């Protein structure tokens, strides 16, 4: 299988106005892609668009709330052909279940889970018609392992992982040449998880957005189906095979359920 060349490709990034979304947009432009920024914060998206153009790249921006199906479809029509879509927009509340409000829980599901459907459904037909494309979702390590204070966030990321696994199976069953890449990173230092901590920073470090963005774009070009970051995160799927008591002890040793004890975070779109 030949590598995907981002040079000349049209790359759509949701939540592209900040954080890792911004980084992926900027770096994709540096690789020669035309970058399409979607963000609910239109001014943030415009700033990234202007940043890319100032550096000599090609970009456009659209104000889009991915929970609004009609708005997503209109933005997809305005954006034109998309070769690579990166489902990056997301939110986190970081509260215990009984402290979470109904509105917060509902909004987390609408953005993190349902938004994947609306965006992917809007751009996938064009990819299939052209006989090529790449669907990428920035899920989370919390989509592989349930974490305290993330009952809503973790559940939506499990949904994202399942969505992408099913989409990949569907494309293969239908004989569609569409790449499907699921990215499951540990905490990324974007402000979204401000205050989150790790007990073993050498094994599970808080990741830097620039290197993560680079890894994601490399994985897209290599047509990889999955990307788990950091490398130690690759043991998480295997850990699920352990007996529950041993699994719980391992999680306790790694301090998994204490990572959110000092969480502050910020509301908004994830990069």
What residues fall within each predicted segment?
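Conserved glycine-rich cofactor-binding loop
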Residues: 10, 17-18, 41
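Active-site helix of classical SDR
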Residues: 120, 156
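The beta1-alpha1 cofactor-binding region of Rossmann-like NAD(H)/NADP(H)-dependent oxidoreductases
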Residues: 42, 63-74, 102
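SDR active-site lid
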Residues: 170-233
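Residue(s) in the substrate-gating loop at a strand-loop-helix junction
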Residues: 140
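Substrate-binding pocket helix/loop in short-chain dehydrogenase/reductase
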Residues: 96-97, 101-106
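Conserved NAD(P)H cofactor-binding loop of Rossmann-fold oxidoreductase domains
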Residues: 88-93
